[in-house]
Structure formats: C-alpha cells, structure tokens
Amino acid sequence: MAETLITKPPLSLSFTSLSSMLPSLSLSTANRHLSVTDTIPLPNSNSNATPPLRIAIIGFGNYGQFLAETLISQGHILFAHSRSDHSSAARRLGVSYFTDLHDLCERHPDVVLLCTSILSIENILKTLPFQRLRRNTLFVDVLSVKEFAKTLLLQYLPEDFDILCTHPMFGPQSVSSNHGWRGLRFVYDKVRIGEERLRVSRCESFLEIFVREGCEMVEMSVTDHDKFAAESQFITHTLGRLLGMLKLISTPINTKGYEALLDLAENICGDSFDLYYGLFVYNNNSLEVLERIDLAFEALRKELFSRLHGVVRKQSFEGEAKKVHVFPNCGENDASLDMMRSEDVVVKYEYNSQVSGSVNDGSRLKIGIVGFGNFGQFLGKTMVKQGHTVLAYSRSDYTDEAAKLGVSYFSDLDDLFEEHPEVIILCTSILSTEKVLESLPFQRLKRSTLFVDVLSVKEFPRNLFLQTLPQDFDILCTHPMFGPESGKNGWNNLAFVFDKVRIGMDDRRKSRCNSFLDIFAREGCRMVEMSCAEHDWHAAGSQFITHTVGRLLEKLSLESTPIDTKGYETLLKLVENTAGDSFDLYYGLFLYNPNAMEQLERFHVAFESLKTQLFGRLHSQHSHELAKSSSPKTTKLLTS
C-alpha cells in the first residue's frame, strides 16, 4: 500500500504546556451542588395578570432571532441591537430594533439577554452604557461555556445588577428535528439575584419562558456545567467536525449508526469554527478531553497494527504467506476521498408476495446453519417462523437454544451434511471463516448446494468461496446490514445486500436462490443487489468509520450527564451498539476490507488537522496578547 503522508502540527506545543495558556477562571463565589429541579408548574389561566417582560437582546444574529420568535409568541416586549444590520428581521418578528446601544438602554428593559459569541462577549460588555439602564437590571447570557461567562459578568457589571447564567442545550437545528423545545434541557445558575420580591419574581418570570415551552429545567453551578459539557458538548463537536472533514456522504447501504453520524456531522458543521474554538479555549476541562481523545485513537490504531503485525509474522515464520489475502487497492482513484456513490450498481430486488406470510410447500427450503451463535440463532428464528426447515451446527453446544427455536441441532458436521440441506449459511466470524470452510465435508452434500455467507466484508468471502468450494456449488454473498440489536423490532426497511456470485443457469437453482432471498424480502428488508467490490467500497466509509468512532468513544468510558445534548445521546447509543460486538469483528473489518486502511489514515489525518487548527489559533492568540502587553521596544522586536 502506498505510504500515507501525515502532516503533524508545526508547533512544539504539548498538552501540558498549553494548559498554562488557557484562561484561569477562579471563582470568587462558592459553587452550588448539582441539583436538577422539578418542573415548575405552568401558570394557571388567571396568571395573565403578570405583566410581560421587557427584554433587550444584544446580538441579533441567528440565535438571537431564534429566541426572539418564541419570546414574542409569549407576549413579551422585545428590543434588539447588533453590530450587523438585522432591522428587516426584527420588523418581521415584531421586535423594536436599535442601531445605537444608548437608545436601547434608555428604554429601560427588565432583562438584557446577551446572545453574542464566546469570543466577542468581553468586548461587548466593555462597550455597554450601564449608566443608561435601571439599577438592578437582570443580565442573562446563553453561552455554551459558563465559568468564563460568570467571571466576566461579575467583573464588568455594576454590583447592583442581577446575573443569571444560562445555557439552552439546543438551537434552531435541534429544535427543528425535535419539533419544538419540549424535553430539551435548559441549564441555569442564579449567580446573583437580589432578595427583593420584584427581582426574585423577574428571574422566575424569565425562566418561566422556557418552562412554558416544555424544557427540562436543570439548575446547576457553572463549574458543574463546564465539567459535564467538556465531555458531552466538546466531544460531540470534536467528532462532528472530524466526520465533516472526512466528507462522508450517504451510501446505498447505510446502517442506522452511520445515518446517525451523518446527521451529527451535518448539525455540527452548521456551527462556526469560532464556537468550537470557544468551547476549547474557555472551558477549563476541554484540553484534558482532547488529550484523552488523542490517546484513545492512538491506542486503537496501535491495537489494530499490533494484531496485523502478529498475523503477518506468524504467517511468514510458518511459510504460509499464501494465506495473506491481497486485494486491489481501490483507493488509488482520488474520487475515493469523497466516497462517491455509484447508484447504477444498485439493483432493486422485486418481490411481490405478501410480507411476512408463510411460504408455500414449493418454496420451503432445508437450510443448514454453520455457526449457531447469536447471529445464527437470530436468523434461524425468522426462518423457522416462515416455515423453513433449519438444521444447525456449531463448535459450542447450542442444543437447548436450538430446541427452543424449533431447529434440529447436530454436534457432527458429517451428520448434518448427510441430511442434504439445499442451502448452507456460514454464520462464522470473519477471522474463522477460512478455517471452517476448509474443514467442511463437501462430499456429503448434494452437488449444486447453495452456499451463503453473511460476513460484514464481501470481497474476502467471495474470493475464498471461489477458491475453496467445488465448482458445481452455487455461491451467494450477502450482508444483512442489521443484527440482533438493530433488528430486534423487525427487519422492515433494513438493508440486505447481496451478490449472486455464481448461480447455475437452470430454473431450479435460480428459483432456490430467489426463495432464499424472499426470506428477507418477506420481512420488509430493503433489498440491495451490488457487487462485492462495490459493497466493500461503501462499507469502508460507512461501517468501518462507524465502528471506529464507536470503539474510540468506548475507550473514553463516556457516561450520561445531566446535560446531555441530542448529539451526545447519539454517541452514547453508538457506543452501546458497537461495544456489544467483539474486537475480532472490528479487526476483521479492518484486515479484510481493502479500503479500511485508507479510511483509518484519513481519520488520523483529519484529527491531526483539527488539532493544528485549534493549537495554531491558540498560538496566534497568545502571541497577539504578548505583543499587546509588551513595551514599545519589545513590540517592535516582535513585529519586525
């Protein structure tokens, strides 16, 4: 394989040394313990007497307008100001727009809502004409980092102003897919609220806005928020940006896990890099999390490469180099970097029988399953339900499991093969398939028996079958793109990929192959006919990347937090699904898919590039701050 050039960041910066460059955000006030509030009761029908709030939004970009739409719908009075001209959007929403901050502040809003970016908030606070506002005005921020915001607000606001630090854990994109704010988390910390009834009531009235929309209200200290957010939010954004850099696109054989990653990449890439950089710089915990991701990915690569090294050494010493299966390098074409879809290879499988009906006598098959573990039992259950006769064999004893499913179990392969099954399904692992195939007593079977595999890689079993099976045996390579977990509620609309590698020309053999495929069509599977090479091309992008991300996250030992975002919940679900698979499966996807190595290296290069972006910008910012704080003489030296 051609050597891949990996560009390292041109900075001599370690994670440890970088920590000294991040802001030190020591807090002068004690942090509250984490507490998740009960839902605040919705106001009763007589609560309309409560006057609406006069809310000024500073920063009327996408997010400010997003919040304004709901605030207006609830009857509150809104003013807005932004550096850019958003007067047209304000008029459309029914918001009074001001180009001059002094004019806005002289309207004496009850609440000032800061909807600025993380990077610009300090400059905004420095320019606000606080003297134009009423004393004790409530200031609210909605930043994704909270210790930083709290520290700035305490530093710049007059002492008689109230402070409420909040983080709506959602935005326009997540609300659109969720159809509203219901069930989405709203995190807040009452940093400084005066004891007078009016000020307490005003704060509660503001929080009530989000309660009315069905948000899950979570009260916690800003310190706890940032600790949890470094995992849930920063990891989600890091993985989303990595996937976006890989330029993955939908394929004809998407799994549910891969579709979730595509959605994540689409959502995250809609955010600016400034937001991601702000999460990195202004959350004290993010640098440690980035280092953990780095170490986890290196550990995963080392685990794969060390196993590969061991296999090659073993084969070399035993003089069995013939067992190393070399495939054409499909990665030479530059188009592979964009995972271009070849839709012309996808053939729609036509099936006209009634879904899930039992088969007639003429279509009933006698099927032998070799390898009766979880996946073999999973398939056998449906085949028996449809009226097929199922026989099974495995190295381990599954007699009891077979009896429960109505499957005839054999402890001797010769005995099973002498029953002359029409179809043999190999449900073995990728790594054991060759050894199992070489041990089969083919002479006990009828000539022209149909052999089927269900492996997650396809060129490898295709070549193995053609090399090992007698020439008068039929070959059908398949990949059910689901398993016991993803298919536990039925197979409807789940992809079943197949390639009729070698099917005899007579009607009986064609009919037998179609009867086998009908098993999956009857259950509502999306039948996709494509070549083994095309399958492996797409699977390297979809399946291997999905398993790589799942394995990477598993090494981070992620846990649910009180402030999980929808994106983070997607990652947790992915870990749950992939962690149930053995490492042998993942290693098999890597070893026997000729495109997997290229994808692993692309992931590595993308991660290095992302770190370069972060550290390069951090280094530039640090140099700029040094230049600003230097004497004129030093500044001249730095800039010359």
UniProtKB/Swiss-Prot annotation:
Transit peptide range per the UniProt entry: 1-18
Pathway: Amino-acid biosynthesis; L-tyrosine biosynthesis; L-tyrosine from L-arogenate (NADP(+) route): step 1/1
Domain Prephenate/arogenate dehydrogenase: residue ranges: 53-334, 365-640
Keyword NADP assigned: yes
The entry's keywords: Amino-acid biosynthesis, Aromatic amino acid biosynthesis, Chloroplast, NADP, Oxidoreductase, Plastid, Repeat, Transit peptide, Tyrosine biosynthesis
One Pfam family matching this protein: PDH_N
GO biological process: tyrosine biosynthetic process
Residue stretches spanning the membrane: none
Reactions catalysed: L-arogenate + NADP(+) = L-tyrosine + CO2 + NADPH
Upregulation: Strongly inhibited by tyrosine.
Source organism superkingdom: Eukaryota
Main location: plastid
The protein's enzyme class: oxidoreductase
Presence of keyword Cell division: no
Enzyme Commission number(s) of this protein: 1.3.1.78
Gene Ontology molecular functions: arogenate dehydrogenase (NADP+) activity; NAD+ binding; prephenate dehydrogenase (NAD+) activity; prephenate dehydrogenase (NADP+) activity
Function: Involved in the biosynthesis of tyrosine. Has no prephenate dehydrogenase activity.
Additional comment: Unlike TYRAAT2, TYRAAT1 is composed of two highly similar and catalytically active peptide domains. No proteolytic cleavage between the two domains.
Protein name: Arogenate dehydrogenase 1, chloroplastic
Lineage: Eukaryota, Viridiplantae, Streptophyta, Embryophyta, Tracheophyta
